[in-house]
C-alpha cells in the first residue's frame, strides 16, 4: 500500500473517467532540461574530475542545445575512451555524424566517421542511410543505391527478428 508520510494515500481506479494524453515536451522545456543536466554534469566534473561516463551525457546535452562543435568534441572523446553506454552505444556515433553534417564539415571526414559507425554497428540501417545521403550529395548514385538497398535489407532483417 502506498502511504503519504503521515497518512494513508487513497488510490482510485477510474478507467472510464480520466484520460491522460501526453503530448511530449516543447522545445523550450527540453532545452531547459538539457541546460539543467549540463550544469549538473559540469558541477560533478568540477568536484571529481571528468570521467569517461560523463562524455556521452555531455555529448547528448550539447547536441540538444545545438552546440555542434562541443557535440563533436565529446562524441570523439567518448568513442576514444571506449566507454560503454548500455542501450545507447550507437547514439554517440549518431550525434557525431549529425553534428558534422549540421556544420557542413568535410564530406570525406564525415564519410570516415559514418564508415566507422557501420563497422561498429553493421546491423543498423541508420548509418547506411547516412552514407547514402552523403553519396547522393556527391552524385555517386550507384554507391548511394547500394547503401539504400542495405538500408532496406537491414529494415527487413529487423522485422523478421
Region spans (language model):
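Structural register within alpha-helical repeat arrays
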Residues: 58, 96-98, 131
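Start-of-helix register in tetratricopeptide repeats
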Residues: 53, 87-91, 126
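TPR-repeat structural position
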Residues: 34, 68, 106-108, 141
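Residue at a conserved register position within TPR or TPR-like alpha-solenoid repeats
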Residues: 62, 100-102, 135
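Structural motif corresponding to the intra-repeat A-B loop/turn of tetratricopeptide repeats
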Residues: 65, 103-105, 138
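Tetratricopeptide repeat
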Residues: 35-38, 42-45, 72, 79, ...
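Short coil turns that delineate tetratricopeptide repeat
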Residues: 49, 83, 87, 122-123, ...
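Catalytic-site signature of metal-activated, phosphate-bearing donor transferases
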Residues: 1-73
Amino acid at each position: 500500500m502506498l502511504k503519504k508520510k503521515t497518512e494513508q494515500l487513497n488510490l482510485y481506479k477510474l478507467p472510464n473517467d480520466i484520460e491522460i494524453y501526453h503530448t511530449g515536451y516543447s522545445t523550450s522545456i527540453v532545452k531547459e532540461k538539457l541546460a539543467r543536466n549540463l550544469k549538473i554534469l559540469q558541477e560533478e566534473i568540477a568536484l571529481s574530475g571528468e570521467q569517461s561516463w560523463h562524455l556521452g551525457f555531455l555529448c547528448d546535452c550539447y547536441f540538444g542545445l545545438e552546440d555542434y562543435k562541443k557535440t563533436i568534441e565529446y562524441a570523439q572523446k567518448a568513442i576514444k575512451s571506449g566507454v560503454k553506454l548500455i542501450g545507447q552505444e550507437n547514439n554517440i556515433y549518431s550525434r557525431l555524424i549529425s553534428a558534422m553534417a549540421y556544420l557542413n564539415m568535410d564530406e570525406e571526414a564525415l564519410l570516415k566517421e559514418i564508415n566507422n559507425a557501420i563497422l561498429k554497428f553493421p546491423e543498423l540501417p541508420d548509418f547506411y542511410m547516412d552514407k547514402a545521403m552523403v553519396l547522393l550529395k556527391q552524385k555517386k548514385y550507384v554507391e548511394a543505391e547500394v547503401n539504400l538497398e542495405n538500408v532496406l535489407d537491414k529494415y527487413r532483417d529487423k522485422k523478421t527478428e
